Amino acid sequence: MRLSDFDFALPEGLVAQAPVTPRDASRLMVLAPGEGAPAHRGFADLPELLAPGDLLVFNDTRVIPARLLGHKASGGKVELLLCEPLEGGLGRRWRAMGQASKPIREGAVLAFDGLEARVDAVEGEGFYRVTLDRQGAELEAALGRAGRIPLPPYIRRAPDAEDAARYQTIWARAPGSAAAPTAGLHFTEPLLARLAARGVRRTAVTLHVGPGTFLPIRGDDLDAHRMHGERYEVSPAAAAELAAARARGGRIVAVGTTSVRTLESAWRDGEVAPGPGRTELFIRPGHPFRAVDAMVTNFHLPRSTLLVLVCAFGGQGRVLAAYREAVARGYRFFSYGDAMLLLRR
């Protein structure tokens, strides 16, 4: 299977540079079961498109100010992106991406406006293992001072005060992500209330978003691509909600590709098992979806693991045709863009 089969032309002007207000004012393309044409709705219409007994599954990870700009002991400039907490939550040990004018060496101490990081290991390809000089609430405060919101590079502006709130879901709880689970950015409290009144239930899992989600695929052979691991957790309460939804015949509606990957990774012996884990699952066409019946997702980059996942879920030809229609109709793409609802039943 070739990466070049997952390409499409996207005018630069359709890449959303800022969020809409309110959050649920974004557009929603709907791909229902069968071969019919996509429907074009607003995201605020979501309660009408789901049924009583369905279960929405959110990713409750919280984006941290993970981009750090500082100096090495020599005075040279260095940039670090905290990608994966190795101890869970805001611990001291992290996997990070780094760049500097000269190589970053093992044992180096990097300073970021009062926060220090010691390089414990050089993994190669720009990845490092580092130990920070604080953890927990002290680390959260230090990142608030020294860190920046890690907006994706296709947002061609500096982060501002609005991004601190808008590049975060309203239910974000567990700090640790270097990117937002963007399908969740469309939800508002009034929309959640309307979904609940409709009889749609909700629960949350946690996957800390890192390079496994946002790094590009190198080369054209999909079978040769290896995902970077990302840590996830399914609570016993979430596992029970998922089992109950199955028992009553409700659909499992994953909000975002990270929720899809969490649920599919945690599938054991006919159910989603509770507990922590680390996933390197690369979902591509041919994957046997077991845990998910529907998904909400944004419009993704050409030639990305995220687009490949959506094609696996909704059918490659149908999804790519829908993307071409989205371009023709002026849908907004990527993190701050519009959304798609894909239903398998």
From Swiss-Prot:
<dbReference type="GO" id="GO:0002099">
    <property type="term" value="P:tRNA wobble guanine modification"/>
</dbReference>
<dbReference type="InterPro" id="IPR003699">
    <property type="entry name" value="QueA"/>
</dbReference>
<dbReference type="GO" id="GO:0051075">
    <property type="term" value="F:S-adenosylmethionine:tRNA ribosyltransferase-isomerase activity"/>
</dbReference>
<comment type="pathway">
    <text>tRNA modification; tRNA-queuosine biosynthesis.</text>
</comment>
<comment type="function">
    <text>Transfers and isomerizes the ribose moiety from AdoMet to the 7-aminomethyl group of 7-deazaguanine (preQ1-tRNA) to give epoxyqueuosine (oQ-tRNA).</text>
</comment>
<keyword id="KW-0949">S-adenosyl-L-methionine</keyword>
<keyword id="KW-0963">Cytoplasm</keyword>
<dbReference type="Pfam" id="PF02547">
    <property type="entry name" value="Queuosine_synth"/>
</dbReference>
<dbReference type="InterPro" id="IPR036100">
    <property type="entry name" value="QueA_sf"/>
</dbReference>
<comment type="similarity">
    <text>Belongs to the QueA family.</text>
</comment>
<keyword id="KW-0808">Transferase</keyword>
<dbReference type="GO" id="GO:0005737">
    <property type="term" value="C:cytoplasm"/>
</dbReference>
<protein>
    <recommendedName>
        <fullName>S-adenosylmethionine:tRNA ribosyltransferase-isomerase</fullName>
        <ecNumber>2.4.99.17</ecNumber>
    </recommendedName>
</protein>
<dbReference type="InterPro" id="IPR042119">
    <property type="entry name" value="QueA_dom2"/>
</dbReference>
<comment type="subunit">
    <text>Monomer.</text>
</comment>
<dbReference type="GO" id="GO:0008616">
    <property type="term" value="P:queuosine biosynthetic process"/>
</dbReference>
<keyword id="KW-0671">Queuosine biosynthesis</keyword>
<dbReference type="InterPro" id="IPR042118">
    <property type="entry name" value="QueA_dom1"/>
</dbReference>
